[in-house]
Amino acid sequence: MLHSALINVMVKAARRAGRSLKRDLGEVENLQVSLKGPANFVTMADKRAEEMLYTDLIKARPGYGFIGEEGGTREGADKSHTWIVDPLDGTTNFLHGIPQFAISIGLQREGTMIAGLIYNPANDDLYIAERGKGAFLNDQRLRVAGRRNLGECVIACGLPHIGRGDHDLSRLEMTEIQNRVAGLRRFGAAALDMAFVASGRLDGYWERNLSPWDMAAGQIIVREAGGIVSGIEGDDDPLKTGNLICGNEFVHAELVKILKPLGK
């Protein structure tokens, strides 16, 4: 499949950083049994991957801004374009040698996401989307699942880390959703949860207190697969609020109906 020059830039950068992370994953697995543990090693792997992505993306598109999880915001001469990057989404999974992690690259133009990529180096799954051109997994066109009965749906969520977020609210939300769906899952990588919604593997996903790099790429991939993405209020911008719901039109509306009142 032929890609645009922009997508080719993103794919090339992601694959190079992905090779580094895959090598590092092997070392992480070895460190599981050591007294020192892999935490410091994973921190360095995360930073190394971000620098590789920054180098490749800015070399290809000089002047673009860059927002990364590790390095923060780096201003560019071109104020209208900004890369939004998570070099290692699912860090805790990676830390434990669980192959559910991803590189996430989104490109924003004047406040609108125009391209997104999510890449899992562990299994080589590559999700891409460009505004108006559809979403793809390994060159296969994606569509969100079409289920319209919540009782048949599998929904994913995120959980707040220790010392962060509202744990009581999280438990309440999970209880309310679990009572209505076929299954509730927590995989630990927001970008991949969104990619799974885009591919129809999951019917919906919600999470609070996300950062822009967690969901920038996933947002456009879900939308280009025919899904709806919003904040938990239903009409707000998740990149600004940090709270996100996505799914097909029916599932999205049902999740908003259930979750919106709980956060009041």
Enumerate the language-model features and the residues they cover.
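Solvent-exposed alpha-helices and their adjacent loops that cap or buttress functional pockets
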Residues: S34, E75-A77, E110, I128, ...
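Generic detector of well-ordered alpha-helical packing
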Residues: K47, E51, E70, P87-G90, ...
